[in-house]
Each structure stands twice: as structure tokens, then as C-alpha cells.
């Protein structure tokens, strides 16, 4: 019996789908779904895969996304509880984990999420042994270390979203004070994605003009303009959003899409992301924290050797020590 499809379409050649930019997102909570939307809007993937243990929510989110396909050039979107669906991914983004509670620091989350990673990582590496891993789950620096150890991947292919968002917040707050768009404000936050992060005031500039040349005490407690409050807002804003709306999602998802674009398009842009930092700035342990990295199709290809002041380097070492105090107690 003839069907509409057979009457409409004549097969011309057999084809086998080959996905060059397959992205898998593990976890369809508020962050995972926001990452999916941000990546779809940038048109970065030719197949997007969603994985979650909550099958009902997973199917609902997948259908909701699929039904928007007429409004954008949407790739194939598939989902499953089974990690087989992630096979041959170019990039796997991990957002799954226990949600941060009100008043809970990112470091308090760690042991609850380590056990979740022990279930996820072996499944991911089994089906996508050549993928890059982008870790988003908090505490992101320690869990990027956990993913590196559990996966056995080379260090360049295990990346934490780290301080890419912190640096964006930093630039935004600087821009708000100066009346300049954040894109034109250049500055980095390094170290832990969290309370011990380090603002690199010595490198903050607008159009190549270092703000430290205009105010040598910028960012210190001697600064009459109290620019240190900018960094305090970077740290507190995440907690404030969790208190007000229960979670954060849009800022981090746009940050993840930004990192994804650099990786899949081999842009070799510089991002402050979490990577193995042993041997840098006097750090002697296998600590993952954010330093400026060049991102491309092989993950982290190079690091930028930023010259820090003695005070900034001391703060970075203290940030590493903060992470090490937790990390050394982990049971992998």
C-alpha cells in the first residue's frame, strides 16, 4: 500500500549519519536544560543528547525542546537513561549532581557528588573514549579532579567551567561602576570557583588602560573607592540568587555555551577554566583550579603565563590550599 511518504519521497542514496559535533548533557535539572537551550541557540551541535536518571522529567524536557524545532535550525535531539545514547560524543557536559542548599558552600557539596560521579564517569568513557569532558557540577574544581581521576583521560580533555562565569560577573560589575559595557572591561578571576577566588586587579584594564595605573590601591583595603566590593559581589551574587530563586542557571549556561563554542569551533580563545595546576604559581599538589587556558578542538592546548603580584600569587596558593584540604580527604 502506498503511503504519503513513499509517494512524496524517492530514495536517492543510502546514508549513514555521521555526527561531527555531537554534544551530550548529563543532567536535566535547571542548569542542564539552560545549557541545552544556550547551545541550541548558538547552533553548535548537529546532535544533542540528554541523559538523566529521572525518566519522566527527561522525556518531558526533550519533548518540550523538540516542539520548538520549527522556530530554529534545531539538530536531532535525543534522550535516554541509558548512556549508550551518548556514544561517540565530541563533548560531554556534566551538570548532574546534588543541588546546592541555601547557605551551603560549594565545598560542602563535594562528598555527595563524588558518589554520583562514580556512577556516571565510567559509563561516559565506555561509550565516548575520545570525548572532551566539561564539568559544571559544583564544587566544580574538586569534581573536575574527580572526573580526571575516574576517567583516566589526559589532563587536556578534562575541563572545569571554573571561573569563566566569575570573570564574567567581575567584568559586569566593573562595567556597571564605569558605565561601560562588560565586553569592553577586561579582567580575570582565577583560583577556586567560589569563596577563595582571586581577582587579578593588576591585569584589569579598559582599552589597554590598566586601572591600577589610575589607582595603585585598587582592590585593597587601602582603596578609598573600595573597588574590593566588586569582588565581594562576585562571590556573594551566586549565594544571593540561590536564596532568591533557589538556584542559578542562565549565567552558567551562557558561560558553558561560550566554552563549548571555543572547543567545537577550535577558536583558541582564552578562558579562565579549571585545569590541573600542579607546578604553577608554587602549587605542588594535583589541584584543579582556574588559570587562563587556550581552548580548542583538543580541549586545553596551552596555558597563558599571567604575571601576578606577590599578593595575588599568595592568594592563589591559599585558594589551592583551601581545595586541597577537602580533596585530600576524598575517597575515590
UniProtKB/Swiss-Prot annotation:
Substrate binds at residues 106, 138, 169, 248. It catalyses: (S)-lactate + NAD(+) = pyruvate + NADH + H(+). Pathway: Fermentation; pyruvate fermentation to lactate; (S)-lactate from pyruvate: step 1/1. Coiled coil: none annotated. One of its GO terms (molecular function) is L-lactate dehydrogenase activity. It is an enzyme of class 1 (oxidoreductase). GO terms for biological process: lactate metabolic process; pyruvate metabolic process. The modification N6-acetyllysine is found at residues 5, 57, 81, 118, 232, 243, 318. This is L-lactate dehydrogenase A-like 6A. There is a cross-link at residue 57 (Glycyl lysine isopeptide (Lys-Gly) (interchain with G-Cter in SUMO2)). The gene is LDHAL6A. The lineage of its organism: Eukaryota, Metazoa, Chordata, Craniata, Vertebrata. The keyword Ubl conjugation applies. NAD(+) binds at residues 29-57, 99, 138. One of its GO terms (cellular component) is extracellular exosome. The active site is at residue 193. The modification N6-succinyllysine is found at residues 5, 118, 318. The modification N-acetylalanine is found at residue 2. SUPFAM superfamilies: LDH C-terminal domain-like, NAD(P)-binding Rossmann-fold domains. Belongs to the LDH/MDH superfamily. LDH family. Its EC number is 1.1.1.27. The modification Phosphothreonine is found at residues 309, 322. Keywords: Acetylation, Cytoplasm, Isopeptide bond, NAD, Oxidoreductase, Phosphoprotein, Ubl conjugation.
Amino acid at each position: 500500500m502506498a503511503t504519503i511518504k513513499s509517494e512524496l519521497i524517492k530514495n536517492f542514496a543510502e546514508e549513514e549519519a555521521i555526527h561531527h559535533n555531537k554534544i551530550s548533557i548529563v543532567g536535566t535539572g535547571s542548569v542542564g536544560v539552560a545549557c541545552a537551550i544556550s547551545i541550541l541557540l548558538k547552533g553548535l551541535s548537529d546532535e544533542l543528547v540528554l541523559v538523566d536518571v529521572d525518566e519522566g522529567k527527561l522525556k518531558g524536557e526533550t519533548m518540550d525542546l523538540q516542539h520548538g524545532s520549527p522556530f530554529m535550525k534545531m539538530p536531532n535531539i535525543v534522550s535516554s537513561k541509558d548512556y549508550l545514547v551518548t556514544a561517540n560524543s565530541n563533548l560531554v557536559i556534566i551538570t548532574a549532581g546534588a543541588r546546592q542548599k541555601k547557605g551551603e558552600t560549594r565545598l560542602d557539596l563535594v562528598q555527595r557528588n563524588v558518589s554520583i560521579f562514580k556512577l556516571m564517569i565510567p559509563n561516559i568513557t565506555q561509550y565516548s573514549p575520545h570525548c572532551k569532558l566539561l564539568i559544571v557540577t559544583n564544587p566544580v574544581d574538586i569534581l573536575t579532579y574527580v572526573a580526571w581521576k575516574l576517567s583516566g583521560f589526559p589532563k587536556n580533555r578534562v575541563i572545569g567551567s571554573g571561573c569563566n562565569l566569575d570573570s564574567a560577573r567581575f567584568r559586569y560589575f566593573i562595567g556597571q561602576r564605569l558605565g561601560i559595557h562588560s565586553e569592553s572591561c577586561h579582567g580575570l578571576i582565577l583560583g577556586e570557583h567560589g569563596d577563595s577566588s582571586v581577582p587579578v586587579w593588576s591585569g584589569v584594564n579598559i582599552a589597554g588602560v590598566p586601572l591600577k595605573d589610575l589607582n595603585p590601591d585598587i582592590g585593597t583595603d587601602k582603596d578609598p573607592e573600595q573597588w574590593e566590593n566588586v569582588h565581594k559581589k562576585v562571590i556573594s551574587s551566586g549565594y544571593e540568587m540561590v536564596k532568591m530563586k533557589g538556584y542559578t542557571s542562565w549565567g552558567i549556561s551562557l558561560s558553558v555555551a561560550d566554552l563549548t563554542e571555543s572547543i567545537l569551533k577550535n577558536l583558541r580563545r582564552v578562558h579562565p577554566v579549571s585545569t590541573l595546576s600542579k607546578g604553577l604559581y608554587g602549587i605542588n599538589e594535583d589541584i584543579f583550579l582556574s588559570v587562563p587556558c587556550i581552548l580548542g578542538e583538543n580541549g586545553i592546548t596551552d596555558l597563558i603565563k599571567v604575571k601576578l603580584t606577590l599578593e595575588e600569587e599568595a592568594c592563589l596558593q591559599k585558594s589551592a590550599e583551601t581545595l586541597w584540604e577537602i580533596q585530600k580527604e576524598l575517597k575515590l
